[in-house]
């Protein structure tokens, strides 16, 4: 058989032409030790803080510590199969998450991966998780109201768009209920909501999602869940993932609301990570930068200036206290970062005062300038009246022979407490709140409060039936308040006439 040189060279040329070997160059290191989801890796000299690493099995990791001869990284996923000596690759990527309208109505994990079984997100945009908060020049003072639908909050501790208002209280005092009611109340208000569940039971998160679906709120809400069974790094990252998704709407000139439920659990997850990374512990074994953990997160909530598109991001962080102790480390940190706090008290909750807001120590530092004029007109003296009632009620326990003025103050205070009670998942529009508070605080032509003759235990029913009556007979009153956002003489006259008419048909039971 004759071997022809030209044929051999042709075959070799064809083989070379089809050969397309790709050389993949990656900086790799090996694991020195791995414990509870934190790995120490040798050999990644070029790694950057916050960079993503690739562990065996495609599991991602996040660089947290950069030391002289090794790197400390948190493993973002199951870590049971990862052993000492396993190779780890640098990706050169900084952690980023999907953002955009595609996330509305979805449930995602702490890294933005869908966990609701409804397929991929198909998001067109991605953003880095850690970015700098807007500076002073880019901001504008808070001036637009963000209604919660709860009389006790909208009247006494109003919240504005772009504000950070802390909700704190012991476990089972209704903190999540306040947050969920706020989401439900903003249906149709062009407010995009983000609910971040940190370290909660999966059954609790499922219940929240069911509630939002039931009331049609899921279409403008995204739920970010890092449950109790997720690794500590996921619980630490989830709030940053949520705020990155919410910032997309803020920066495009729209309005967003983010709820962190709750930041106490994020601080615990961060403490766990820091101790495993052998960072020096401080007070209550938290690391020295636990304040910065929350401040850099909450500073990203802002009301942007007109030049920046006038968008806003409002934050409602939740903190769980132990036995009502607001002076503990994490609560005081977050109180000092936020623009006010709503304190929920277990004693009030058990007495049936729900929402169980302690009006005395709850405050909104910037929300007053965002409150509508009509609410200021009717609720101006409400906080002072309630404070006087609480003071007198404490003294009245010791004496039985009280003068008439004291008895009147106590009777008025009892009715005001009843006036502010509200059922769960029953938020009220601001104009209906104004009507109810007007009926509770203003006087008729005889100088008596409109609800003075109503027995205390029937005030809640009176308020409910009053709204039903006005909706049926005088719908124009609420409409006028909603349009003018103030109570002029004409509206007051119509409201007084309607209250007089209602007083004639309201039946006192018993």
UniProtKB/Swiss-Prot annotation:
One of its GO terms (molecular function) is ADP binding. The keyword Phosphoprotein does not apply. HAMAP family: ATP_synth_alpha_bact. Keywords: ATP synthesis, ATP-binding, Cell inner membrane, Cell membrane, CF(1), Hydrogen ion transport, Ion transport, Membrane, Nucleotide-binding, Translocase, Transport. It is found in: Cell inner membrane. F-type ATPases have 2 components, CF(1) - the catalytic core - and CF(0) - the membrane proton channel. CF(1) has five subunits: alpha(3), beta(3), gamma(1), delta(1), epsilon(1). CF(0) has three main subunits: a(1), b(2) and c(9-12). The alpha and beta chains form an alternating ring which encloses part of the gamma chain. CF(1) is attached to CF(0) by a central stalk formed by the gamma and epsilon chains, while a peripheral stalk is formed by the delta and b chains. Its main location: membrane. GO terms for cellular component: plasma membrane; proton-transporting ATP synthase complex. The record marks 362 as: Required for activity. It comes from Anaeromyxobacter dehalogenans (strain 2CP-1 / ATCC BAA-258). It is a peripheral membrane protein. It is an enzyme of class 7 (translocase). Belongs to the ATPase alpha/beta chains family. Signal peptide: none annotated. Its EC number is 7.1.2.2. This is ATP synthase subunit alpha. NCBIfam families: atpA, PRK13343.1. PANTHER family: ATP SYNTHASE SUBUNIT ALPHA, MITOCHONDRIAL. Produces ATP from ADP in the presence of a proton gradient across the membrane. The alpha chain is a regulatory subunit. ATP binds at residues 169-176. It catalyses: ATP + H2O + 4 H(+)(in) = ADP + phosphate + 5 H(+)(out).
